[in-house]
Swiss-Prot record:
Cofactor binding comment, as recorded: Binds 1 [4Fe-4S] cluster.
Source organism, top-level taxon: Bacteria
Chemical reaction(s) catalysed: (2E)-4-hydroxy-3-methylbut-2-enyl diphosphate + oxidized [flavodoxin] + H2O + 2 H(+) = 2-C-methyl-D-erythritol 2,4-cyclic diphosphate + reduced [flavodoxin]
Family: Belongs to the IspG family.
Keyword 4Fe-4S recorded: yes
UniProtKB keywords: 4Fe-4S, Iron, Iron-sulfur, Isoprene biosynthesis, Metal-binding, Oxidoreductase
InterPro entries xref list: Dihydropteroate_synth-like_sf, IspG_bac, IspG_bac-typ, NO2/SO3_Rdtase_4Fe4S_sf
Entry EC no(s): 1.17.7.3
Coiled coil: none
GO molecular-function terms, A-Z: 4 iron, 4 sulfur cluster binding; 4-hydroxy-3-methylbut-2-en-1-yl diphosphate synthase activity (ferredoxin); 4-hydroxy-3-methylbut-2-enyl-diphosphate synthase activity (flavodoxin); iron ion binding
Cofactor: [4Fe-4S] cluster
Residues that bind [4Fe-4S] cluster: C253, C256, C288, E295
Name assigned to this protein: 4-hydroxy-3-methylbut-2-en-1-yl diphosphate synthase (flavodoxin)
Length: 344
């Protein structure tokens, strides 16, 4: 089991549940917009939020932001050690730095500030920060991250989170497998510069999913260009699919000419309405009753289309026939019954 660190009220590592992170896209000093975006991320299920700190104005904004949010905040600093210290002084729950960009004396100052507040430091590497280059780039990536760790250890600092990220899936997997054998610190997983839409989802799901199945990884961020809320939704779905997080899983048939309902939109509507449920339940959306009920019998709850309506079934047993406009309402009714049953 990996050692644990505490980020605000969230524990990373040490057998704690894998947490879902994201990063704001706003200018941090724009406090109102940053808080608004973080609140949207909180509602989606984000558990740790990271903000970019590029100047003193950003660092000083952290205190005001923290007053209005519920989740821990991580300050991301690239070069200036003074911004790291200022972020810590203003209440950051964790900082992310690159120790290799700082002199020994300046790193000592940052470490002293972090120790004084009892907060962890995240270090690591991506392909842009590789210190040496050989024919095995994944290993260069991992060794660069380990060098960052050693710099902190030399200063007597051990509340560390480590990340190694590449835009290449195999490099990300190999590098994380390598460092998992070398250190006991918690590992932050992600695929950097993963891209947009489906490309980012596919790459992140493969790399993060593979590593989590091997029991590697303690916190995740799914990088998707655009609205960060989608990062959180996909991250939670990865954990639910792997059985690492409770929640509603919606399964749906791929549709064919027999479909009597709009399977895609129905499934999306159900996901949106039941995404908040924190119980392990499976809901099936099947286009027809020909194979639908049989294929969806493993679901806790389901709907199958009819020419003039739909049938609702619970654990493979048909409960009632309804018109299409009442499907969601009746599903909610049976879902509440299932939730009451689970609570008993």
């Amino acid at each position: 089991m990996r050692k644990s660190v505490k980020v605000g009220n969230v524990v990373i590592g040490g057998g704690a549940p894998v947490s879902v992170q994201s990063m704001t896209t706003t200018k941090t000093a724009d406090v109102e917009r940053t808080i608004s975006q973080i609140k949207r991320l909180e509602r989606a299920g984000c558990e740790i939020i990271r903000v970019a700190v590029q100047d003193e104005e950003d660092a000083k904004a952290i205190r005001r932001i923290k007053e209005q949010i519920e989740i821990p905040l991580v300050a991301d600093i690239q070069f200036d050690y003074r911004l790291a210290i200022l972020s810590i002084d203003n209440g950051a729950d964790k900082i992310r730095i690159n120790p290799g960009n700082m002199s020994r004396d300046r790193l000592k100052d940052v470490v002293a500030a972090a120790k004084g507040k009892g907060i962890p430091i995240r270090v690591g590497a991506n392909v842009g920060s590789i210190k040496r280059r050989t024919s095995e780039r994944w290993k260069d990536l991992a060794e660069s991250a380990l060098e960052e760790v050693r710099l902190l250890e030399k200063e007597g600092f051990y509340d560390i989170v480590v990340s190694v990220k590449s835009s290449d899936i195999l490099e990300t997997i190999k590098a994380n497998e390598y460092i998992a054998e070398k250190i006991e610190y918690p590992i932050h997983l992600g695929v950097t510069e993963a891209g947009v839409s489906e490309t980012a989802v596919v790459k992140s799901s493969i790399a993060i999913g593979h590593l989590l199945l091997k029991n590697i990884g303690d916190t995740i961020r799914v990088s998707i260009s655009g609205d960060p809320v989608r990062e959180v939704i996909v991250g939670k779905k990865i954990l639910i699919a792997l059985g690492l997080r409770e929640g509603v899983e919606v399964i749906a048939c791929p549709t064919c000419g027999r479909a009597e309902i709009d399977v895609e939109n129905m499934a999306k509507m159900i996901e949106e309405n039941f995404f908040h449920v924190q119980k392990r339940l499976k809901i099936a959306v099947m286009g027809c009753v020909v194979n639908g009920i049989g294929e969806g019998k493993d679901a806790d709850l389901g709907v199958a289309g009819l020419r003039d309506g739909a049938v609702i079934f619970v654990k493979g047993e048909i409960k009632e026939r309804v018109s299409k406009e009442f499907v969601l309402e009746r599903l909610k009714h049976y879902l509440n019954e299932l939730l009451e049953e689970v609570e008993r």
